[in-house]
Amino acid sequence: MSIKEELMEIIEAIKYTSEKPEEIVHGKGPRIIVKESRIIDVQGDEGIILEGKEEDGKIKAKIIVKKGYKFKYPIHMCFGITEENISQIIDVEIILEEDSSISLMSHCSFPKGKGIKHIMNGIIKIGKNAKFSYNEFHYHGMDGDILVKPTVKVEIDEGGIYISNFTLTKGRIGTLDIEQEIIAKKDAIIDITTRTYAIKEDVVKVNEVVKLNGENAKCIIKSRGAAMDNSKISLKLKIEGNAPYSKGHIDCAEIVKGNAEVESIPIVVVRDDKARITHEAAIGSVDKKQLETLMAKGLDEDEATEIIVKGMIGDL
């Protein structure tokens, strides 16, 4: 298969995660495009270094944003699997030097979703007063025979900002197992949001730990999701307030329907008497009044439930 044909397959795959896949693949902006276990395209730009190589059955990628460079347009990483029974293993290192800023959009699309493993190990280093905005969009097809396991370690220097949004709300999930550890220095800001919509026998596991080690560091962790049918969602979210005036909040809102199960374990740890960490969780069925209002407009119960759930997780 030619490179052109492979890029066309990638375009078809990421239609599920982007409204303009052609612009991502053929545009002028920085990007890394991976299909199965092969790097199809790497494009850098002034102020940013993008490197990628295939080694020992893995994809190894590195992104370095040079000091002072602030990118107004997003950088794209595309990971596509268009075949069945494929393992895709990726090691990624992302470094933002002092006073730099980027928005990175990661498109992970596996439309056939059968016998697939997508394993990602990430290291992120955010320099002093740098800002990293990361948006990750997934589509896993309709079979559910898939394992996705991202493991990420983040270090944030003084005044650094880390914004992370993970979205998997269309199709099946299969098994999703997220592990993330974040260490924050003075005046760092962290904002993490996870959105999932689990159906049938899908399984979601999220384990996130944030250590506010610097004075005045701040963090919010948000989870928005729904567990339907026989699916299971397990959330273990932890914030440590280890320094004076550090502040953190955990906010979980999950809907359960059918024989599904949601477990939410917020953990707050305070090791300084000037720190403050809080949490709240709301888990339950769809609001009956909202349901009745929509059904009165002609929707059946399943249609009304889907609208309420997707409105809650921000997918409308």
UniProtKB/Swiss-Prot annotation:
GO terms for biological process: iron-sulfur cluster assembly. Pfam families: SUFBD_core (PF01458). This is Iron-sulfur cluster assembly SufBD family protein MJ0034. InterPro entries: Fe-S_cluster_assembly_SufBD, SUF_FeS_clus_asmbl_SufBD_core, SUF_FeS_clus_asmbl_SufBD_sf. Belongs to the iron-sulfur cluster assembly SufBD family.
